[in-house]
Amino acid sequence: MAEMDPVAEFPQPPGAARWAEVMARFAARLGAQGRRVVLVTSGGTKVPLEARPVRFLDNFSSGRRGATSAEAFLAAGYGVLFLYRARSAFPYAHRFPPQTWLSALRPSGPALSGLLSLEAEENALPGFAEALRSYQEAAAAGTFLAVEFTTLADYLHLLQAAAQALNPLGPSAMFYLAAAVSDFYVPVSEMPEHKIQSSGGPLQITMKMVPKLLSPLVKDWAPKAFIISFKLETDPAIVINRARKALEIYQHQVVVANILESRQSFVFIVTKDSETKLLLSEEEIEKGVEIEEKIVDNLQSRHTAFIGDRN
């Protein structure tokens, strides 16, 4: 008996079929070039509480780790499919908050032929020229595709479509699942149609568990791919055991495990038979090295070995 599709009960987002085609073409083109492709998921999902939603429960995530990791994967030669929360951190752009543009840029002359010329002091936007060049190179090469989600339902459907797009690449596909996905949701059939009124007194909500898509991803959607999940804890004493438990349950390849307070300076790369601590030194922090550079470098080496074992 065929297993039920775990995303079927969630409403399909507008444009999902079109995005599925775009992602499939992106993956097929890069696969034909012999290029590895990574899906980077980034940012948090939100869950509506009403059918015509006004109120939501939101899993907050800035998306910085996903955006910075996407940059590192592009620098390493991967094609990057970036599935991210709308208005969360975007590769390269996240380094330059909007408010800095207002003080850093100024018109350099009258607009000609509909073009506005701007200039900025180099020290007002440090690193901007390099970031712009890197982004434009990826865009010109067609190695970067960004796809937005907002709600949990958006994310689940687009993740499934992305997996189906990358599945034909076999072990050359990587999944880097850094998004902060909601654990609970209200089924559409149980949502009130209109805005929940505060005049009704204290609110009680019964929520269902979100299906763990790591299992169908590993078993059915992309069974030959190299798959990395993330585990964030606040207690250092349990983080490795929790990571190993996830590997045992889902049978994927790697868990990136980290502690809330130190997640930007060290992580553990955990596999079924090893654990590796990646740590930024004080000197590296002063030089602006980011932990995501070390994570991606480590995973790239593991991905190479993974591909070699299957060829």
Curated annotation (Swiss-Prot):
Annotated metabolic or biological route of this protein: Cofactor biosynthesis; coenzyme A biosynthesis; CoA from (R)-pantothenate: step 2/5
Residues with PTM N-acetylalanine: A2
- One Pfam assignment: DFP
Q: Name one GO molecular function term.
A: phosphopantothenate--cysteine ligase activity
Question: What reaction does this catalyse?
Answer: (R)-4'-phosphopantothenate + L-cysteine + ATP = N-[(R)-4-phosphopantothenoyl]-L-cysteine + AMP + diphosphate + H(+); (R)-4'-phosphopantothenate + L-cysteine + CTP = N-[(R)-4-phosphopantothenoyl]-L-cysteine + CMP + diphosphate + H(+)
Is-annotated flag, keyword Acetylation? Answer: yes
Q: What results from changing E233V?
A: In CMD2C; decreased phosphopantothenate--cysteine ligase activity; decreased protein abundance in patient fibroblasts
Example of a GO cellular component annotation carried by this entry: cytoplasm
Q: Name one GO biological process term.
A: coenzyme A biosynthetic process
Effect of substituting A180P: In CMD2C; loss of phosphopantothenate--cysteine ligase activity; decreased protein abundance in patient fibroblasts
Q: Which family does it belong to?
A: Belongs to the PPC synthetase family.
Q: What is this protein called?
A: Phosphopantothenate--cysteine ligase
Q: What is the lineage of its organism?
A: Eukaryota, Metazoa, Chordata, Craniata, Vertebrata
Q: Which gene encodes it?
A: PPCS
